[in-house]
């Protein structure tokens, strides 16, 4: 359906949904089936969210395919076949498109529509959103499905207009194929997108220069073609596994919880456990080796050093190996990266690593990248510099109420939410996997489904009681923020300058944004709030 056909009777909407990623699509499906007049507004030209924009070489999910999928329809989860253990971006995007087609969602999606502002009127309890083209539409409720990693960050360096070569960002990758053959390519950043793309870029490029400020831990994914017997066994118990996932810390079933401290076993036993997890592949498996890897620094040191020794054993040049060894954060306190041949790539003669912590980048020049001690001549620069995570997309929209509440002021010192779903002073505005919810520290699709189901139940409660307005109480929000901080402070997570803390964005407040009390504890809290008549919320006509 064309955008013109989708633009119909905007004032009759019950729910406006912003974003057509996995959260937005499920919200549309769920609410539409309950009889709500809902529509999605999406900046991109099609569905997919992060999987639409992130098309860089090697882009792949770090959650296994059989888990990273919707559970709301059994026929859907039985019929779709995943080709690999970990889904690559093209396959995941195919899956999301299949979901949109199977449930006829596109007829209620307006693409190529970027939301500029959202304003709430207390007079009629309605949100009015305005697009960058000046179009306006209103609804009783607004659901922000804007994603946690959807606002790409590019450093504020001089010289972007001076560089004569090509510039790309992994988070805004072109839809056409990019050929690196014969090119001198610079990759800036060694987070997830850098680690995933560098080995593939190196297979084509004449020379690759990697600019690294901070080394990150990366584990082997051990990706492989999907084994038919594994898929069949998994699908045979899908319903049980999906239910069990809600009783785990990360929302993924199938990982028996550890029972011992890393400090209660011998060094030989400890290293054998790490070796087994390393061979198995996957981040959760490794962090599940012992009970205290994310809460005890001494215990974590053993896991961190094991990983560093793996880097030293893989990278032949020991100076390069040491530069690739992370020392400034405990393993797991930044998002663990999964890779295929990342460290092996540095053994290639045409791949160099530049330490820009000791010699920072000053900017771009006509020829390439200038650091404080050298200029590197390049034909292409790939920025793998991450995102303004968790809050960036929301703050790009001018969200305010006629009572004077503004999102910029609200989150000036860091995000404040109740349950990561709503905010005090912003009635009828819901978030899917917002800050202070498990979101990015969980199986994201499961968390999206849990939030959408909770929001749908909330709207049904309002409808059944003849009410139309809901907003968190300030005290409930304050208590939840304090709880989120206390839970994080009981772990090692705040020790890392991570995007979880907003540390990758200059001037962004340093506050740990995800909820790390676990999916099980979080869902129980959300369910208890609802069961108590939406405790902590003010509900009115």
Predicted regions and their residues:
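Ligand/cofactor pocket segment of small-molecule handling proteins
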Residues: 198
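N-terminal FAD-binding dinucleotide-binding subdomain shared by FAD-dependent oxidases/monooxygenases
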Residues: 2-15, 20-160, 176-177, 190, ...
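Glycine-rich NAD(P)-binding loop of Rossmann-like domains
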Residues: 177-184
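Active-site glycine-rich loop that binds ribose-phosphate moieties when present
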Residues: 170-172
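Active-site proximal beta-strand in glycosyltransferases
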Residues: 161-167
């Amino acid at each position: 359906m064309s955008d013109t056909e989708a633009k119909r009777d905007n004032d009759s909407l019950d729910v406006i949904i912003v974003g057509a990623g996995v959260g937005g699509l499920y919200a549309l499906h769920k609410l539409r089936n309950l009889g709500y007049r809902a529509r999605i507004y999406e900046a991109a030209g099609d569905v997919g969210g992060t999987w639409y924009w992130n098309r860089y070489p090697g882009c792949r999910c770090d959650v296994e395919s059989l888990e990273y999928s919707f559970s709301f329809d059994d026929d859907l989860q039985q019929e779709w076949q995943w080709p690999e253990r970990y889904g690559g971006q093209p396959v995941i995007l195919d899956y999301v498109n299949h979901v949109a087609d199977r449930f006829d969602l596109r007829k209620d999606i307006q693409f190529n529509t970027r939301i500029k502002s959202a304003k709430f009127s207390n007079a009629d309890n309605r949100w009015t959103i305005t697009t960058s083209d000046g179009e306006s539409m209103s609804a009783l409720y607004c659901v922000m499905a804007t994603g946690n990693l959807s606002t790409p960050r590019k450093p504020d360096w001089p010289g972007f207009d001076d560089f004569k070569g090509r510039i790309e960002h992994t988070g805004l990758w072109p839809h056409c194929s990019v050929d690196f053959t014969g090119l001198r390519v610079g990759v800036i950043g060694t987070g997830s997108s850098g680690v995933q793309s560098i080995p593939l870029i190196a297979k084509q490029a004449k020379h690759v220069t990697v600019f690294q400020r901070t080394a990150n831990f990366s584990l082997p994914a051990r990706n492989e073609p999907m084994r038919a017997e594994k898929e069949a066994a998994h699908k045979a118990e899908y319903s049980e596994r999906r239910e069990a996932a809600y009783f785990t810390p990360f929302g993924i079933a199938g990982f028996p919880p550890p029972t011992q401290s890393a400090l209660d076993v011998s060094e030989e036993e400890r290293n054998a456990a790490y070796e087994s997890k390393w061979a198995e592949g996957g981040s959760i498996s490794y962090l599940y080796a012992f009970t205290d890897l994310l809460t005890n620094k001494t215990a974590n040191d053993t896991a961190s050093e094991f990983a560093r020794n793996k880097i030293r054993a893989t990278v032949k040049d020991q100076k390069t190996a040491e530069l690739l060894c992370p020392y400034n954060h405990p393993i797991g306190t930044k998002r663990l990266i999964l890779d295929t041949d990342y460290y092996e790539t540095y053994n290639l003669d045409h791949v160099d690593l530049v330490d820009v912590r000791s010699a920072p980048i000053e900017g771009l020049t006509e020829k390439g990248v200038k650091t404080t001690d050298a200029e590197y001549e390049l034909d292409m620069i790939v920025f793998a510099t991450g995102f303004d995570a968790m809050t960036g997309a929301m703050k790009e929209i001018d969200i305010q109420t006629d009572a004077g509440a503004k999102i910029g002021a609200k989150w000036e010192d860091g995000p404040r939410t109740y349950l990561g779903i709503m905010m005090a002073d912003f009635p009828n505005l819901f978030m899917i996997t917002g800050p202070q919810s498990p979101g990015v520290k969980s199986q994201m699709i499961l968390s999206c489904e849990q939030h959408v189901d909770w929001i749908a139940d909330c709207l049904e409660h309002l409808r059944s009681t003849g009410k139309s307005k809901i907003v968190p109480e300030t005290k409930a929000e304050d208590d939840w923020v304090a709880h989120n901080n206390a839970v994080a402070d009981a772990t090692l997570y705040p020790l890392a300058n991570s995007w979880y803390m907003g540390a990758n964005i200059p001037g962004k407040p340093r506050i740990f944004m995800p909820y790390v009390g676990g999916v099980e504890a979080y869902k129980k809290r959300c369910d208890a709030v609802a069961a108590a008549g939406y405790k902590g919320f003010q509900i009115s006509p």
